[in-house]
């Protein structure tokens, strides 16, 4: 399934769509908001407002690890000590309400925030989106203070003993490697590693620098529950394919692979798949999403050619973020599968209760060969989430494409805590 490089406009849509693709609604602030860690290493949502008058405020911007991309709906708050670390490996990140004595706010679509302060002296400023979290000591005084970007930039890797005080945490991620959809390069461009020239000058990651694991033997990984449980996010991009076949989808039909992926997500893991790897969503979780052309045969929904389409961001938070980074004309480019529709199904929530799960459509391609159809969808399964996009990131140069920025948005959204409310 050889692909051409995507154009920036189309890339933007892909990223933006996927970016919003996962997360649970919160009754605090914007529904796309993530949380922040608590004493048990879990995640907080803001509580009720303070009853005191503030003595001042802290203002700044929340940025991606690479230092320029704004992060919307990140939780920002002040506490007396850094939050306890997240648990190692997969865990059920349930939202907990911050005590009303804790000053907190969310960043806007352009990443800016203004946080009220109620006490003077040394405190810790915490910035978190999903399981990306940074805490830094700060001396709070009366009046308005501007916070340096370095204190509110999401961390590029884990460090629980930052010189000068504070902590950095990121989710543990695994990328299944292959021929196509080099998500690892996009992750590196977003600040999670370094890239170097590869064959014919096409960029590749410098594996000695990356903050995630690359899985070169998926057949020995995807059916291994113990191996999967070491991670918070697993990427299965359109990677294994050769030519225009779906031969690499076959591992998804293995009962041990299906069971391992189901258990990983139910325990709190996040699974991200793209186009020809759609079977890794369809086989473990049948019926939530229907694809055009699908039959009982593995790979039946794979198309022999690609298509581009103008698109629409269905989610208001995603649309606002795209506008904030200057993207107005959405497109999905190099789609190799087409979603027909999503379906409500009976499933389990994070506590094992039987619920109706309705997949969320984040982006719609408006002009597919079958008309307007979903392009990025997600749903919750147990305590985790599953995300799929009909297109993928194409990393053919050293520049940071809009779709690669959207990939960051995806990472953050799939890692937010789960609530009692409807899945997103």
Regions found by a protein language model. Give the residues of each.
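A glycine-rich, often tryptophan-bearing local segment used as a flexible ligand/cofactor-contacting loop or short
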Residues: 242-346
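A short, solvent-exposed beta-strand micro-motif common in secreted/extracellular proteins
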Residues: 76-78, 111-114, 120-137
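Helical hinge/lid and interdomain linker segments adjacent to catalytic or ligand-binding clefts
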Residues: 175-289
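Catalytic beta-strand/loop cores that center a nucleophilic Ser/Cys/Thr
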Residues: 305-399
């Amino acid at each position: 399934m050889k692909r051409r490089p995507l154009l920036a406009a189309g890339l933007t849509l892909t990223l933006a769509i996927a970016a919003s693709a996962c997360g649970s609604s919160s009754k605090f602030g914007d529904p796309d908001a993530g949380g922040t860690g608590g004493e048990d290493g879990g995640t907080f949502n803001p509580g009720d407002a303070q009853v005191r008058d503030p003595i001042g405020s802290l203002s700044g911007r929340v940025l991606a690890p690479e230092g320029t991309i704004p992060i919307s709906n990140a939780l920002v708050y002040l506490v007396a000590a850094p939050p306890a670390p997240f648990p190692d490996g997969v865990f059920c990140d349930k939202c907990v309400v911050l005590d009303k004595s804790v000053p907190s706010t969310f960043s806007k679509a352009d990443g800016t925030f203004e946080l009220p302060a109620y006490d003077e002296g040394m405190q810790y400023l915490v910035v978190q989106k999903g399981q990306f979290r940074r805490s830094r000591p700060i001396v709070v005084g009366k009046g308005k203070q501007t916070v340096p970007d370095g204190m509110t930039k999401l961390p590029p890797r884990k460090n629980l003993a930052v010189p000068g005080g504070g902590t950095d945490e990121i989710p543990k991620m695994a990328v299944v490697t292959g021929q196509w959809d080099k998500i690892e390069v996009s992750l590196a461009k977003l600040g999670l590693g370094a890239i170097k020239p590869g064959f014919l000058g096409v960029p590749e990651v410098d594996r000695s620098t990356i903050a995630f694991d690359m899985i070169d033997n998926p057949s020995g990984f995807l059916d291994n529950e113990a191996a999967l449980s070491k991670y918070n996010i697993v990427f299965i991009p359109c990677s294994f394919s050769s030519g225009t076949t779906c031969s690499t989808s076959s591992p998804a039909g293995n009962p041990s692979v299906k069971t391992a992926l189901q258990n990983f997500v139910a325990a709190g893991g996040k699974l991200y798949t793209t186009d020809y790897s759609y079977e890794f969503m369809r086989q473990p979780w049948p019926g939530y999403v229907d694809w055009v052309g699908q039959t009982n045969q593995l790979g039946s929904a794979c198309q022999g050619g690609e298509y581009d389409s103008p698109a629409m961001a269905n989610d208001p938070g995603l649309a606002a973020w795209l506008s904030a980074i200057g993207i107005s004309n959405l497109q999905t480019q190099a789609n190799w599968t087409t979603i027909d529709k999503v379906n409500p199904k009976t499933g389990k929530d994070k506590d094992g209760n039987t619920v109706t799960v309705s997949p969320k459509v984040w982006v719609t391609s408006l002009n597919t060969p079958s008309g307007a159809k979903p392009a990025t969808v997600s749903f919750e399964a147990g305590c985790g989430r599953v995300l799929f996009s009909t297109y993928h990131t194409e990393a053919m140069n050293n520049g940071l494409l809009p779709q690669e920025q959207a990939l960051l948005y995806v990472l953050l959204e799939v890692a937010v805590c789960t609530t009692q409310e409807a899945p997103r």
